[in-house]
Amino acid sequence: NPKSSTGRVDVFTRLICDGSHEFDKVPGGYKGHLWLEISPRTFPVIVRQGTRLNQMRFRRGRITSSDNELKRLHSEEGIVYNGKADISEGLAISVNLNGNGEDEIVGYKAKRHAGLIDLDKPNKYSVSKFWDPVFTNDENRIILDPGEFYILASHESIAIPPSHAAEMVPFNPSIGEFRVHYCLLYTSD
């Protein structure tokens, strides 16, 4: 998977290995080189040997939870702690269009042609150079422009128990294909 920091600057990555028929999967017992497809979508980026763009997750056994298991976990641990947990084929996460109080910012839209980003210097840049704030309107909605890149806050605040891990699915075919999973950011708020 792309690292969250890679996804937040809209760089799409996919792992490739010899003999595999799928991206981002390495079969058990594999020995050989790994290759990485790197596709910057919004910002031009500088990459060097050793730049960390992807993360590998090792899994063993069943890796998904059923809805009943998620409901039990939410009942016992409180996964969603600021509202109702919408569990149906996984935990649904929705966009927060209420803003954060004073300024009503609901997210950020990437600026095109804002300049190079050196992926080895993540704290070097000001937010305002690369991002425009997105505000909600009087009807509590926003209009998303096709082909643009946005980072929007979720309505739900979640807590993942230490005994579990969470991962966003790449898309839900019932609502469309969105890259919701590749810039996931959990904060401690």
What would you call each of these model-derived segments?
Residues 1-189:
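DUTPase catalytic domain/fold
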